[in-house]
Amino acid sequence: MDLDLLDLNPRIIAAIKKAKLKSVKEVLHFSGPDLKRLTNLSSPEVWHLLRTASLHLRGSSILTALQLHQQKERFPTQHQRLSLGCPVLDALLRGGLPLDGITELAGRSSAGKTQLALQLCLAVQFPRQHGGLEAGAVYICTEDAFPHKRLQQLMAQQPRLRTDVPGELLQKLRFGSQIFIEHVADVDTLLECVNKKVPVLLSRGMARLVVIDSVAAPFRCEFDSQASAPRARHLQSLGATLRELSSAFQSPVLCINQVTEAMEEQGAAHGPLGFWDERVSPALGITWANQLLVRLLADRLREEEAALGCPARTLRVLSAPHLPPSSCSYTISAEGVRGTPGTQSH
């Protein structure tokens, strides 16, 4: 019994045992007034008991935040990431997607959001030493049909994309049988899916990645500008459920989002082109933004801008508690999504 290890007056220890409290942790489950009533100890004695119990569980060492960060082996899940399948993109995100929390990937049409989501569905199936989680993925479609042909192409091209993985291991992986696809058409069906179907797959260890493509589509279809309150409630419910699932099963959640565009006239003082400049921002507003851990933006330039020599596609870190605002360019080929070396900027 660890109660005997506490540096307390034997009379206090006896009072604790008489109250049928069996451990230090059990003592800390009660408030001061409750302990006073259970043990018949005085207020100073109860305060001393709680302080001693707290110090006993905490231990004597005091660690700084830097020391905690450096001792990764003591907190493995806090530092583990899901690789994106590309060393350049992983470097941008310091290893990949965090396991606990929602990552949003917003961007224009044809920016490559779905391509990256499919690549993650394959990456999650690799062993941990190769950046995966040794499990499958749940892919929830809310807009278009699932891109089966593109997935088959990516599966066939894995040996060319993942040159870091031995060929015999690639041959053993059965990528297609580890991706569980759901199609939902409205908000209620989406909420039912994440509340009932997704937890079953996660709890059985069949999946460790949840993808929603896209989160904005059902909300934009069902709720107009006059229905902001019910939309906010449903967004909060969805976000809370996804965060709870991610935390409980240490499974990253990737939500693809649409963007809104604001037009600004760009003159000579603002740039060399003299046309209307589009400023994009993720859809769904502040209610949804508050549910997120990481917010990424996949940006695809227009032909006029790309003609000036700018990178055609850029992945930006808009916000994250562990990442600075940064970006890198990337390309999409038959093999998948690759970051361009030497293009990362802060």
From Swiss-Prot:
GO terms for molecular function: ATP binding; ATP-dependent DNA damage sensor activity; DNA binding. The modification N-acetylmethionine is found at residue 1. One of its GO terms (cellular component) is replication fork. The keyword Manganese does not apply. It holds the Pfam family Rad51. Its main location: nucleus. InterPro entries: DNA_recomb/repair_Rad51_C (IPR013632), DNA_recomb/repair_RecA-like (IPR016467), P-loop_NTPase (IPR027417), RecA_ATP-bd (IPR020588), XRCC3-like_C (IPR047348). It is found in: Nucleus; Cytoplasm; Cytoplasm, Perinuclear region; Mitochondrion. Involved in the homologous recombination repair (HRR) pathway of double-stranded DNA, thought to repair chromosomal fragmentation, translocations and deletions. Part of the RAD51 paralog protein complex CX3 which acts in the BRCA1-BRCA2-dependent HR pathway. Upon DNA damage, CX3 acts downstream of RAD51 recruitment; the complex binds predominantly to the intersection of the four duplex arms of the Holliday junction (HJ) and to junctions of replication forks. Interacts with RAD51C and RAD51. Part of the CX3 complex consisting of RAD51C and XRCC3; the complex has a ring-like structure arranged into a flat disk around a central channel; CX3 can interact with RAD51 in vitro. Forms a complex with FANCD2, BRCA2 and phosphorylated FANCG. Interacts with SWSAP1 and ZSWIM7; involved in homologous recombination repair. Interacts directly with PALB2 which may serve as a scaffold for a HR complex containing PALB2, BRCA2, RAD51C, RAD51 and XRCC3. This is DNA repair protein XRCC3. It comes from Homo sapiens (Human). The gene is XRCC3.
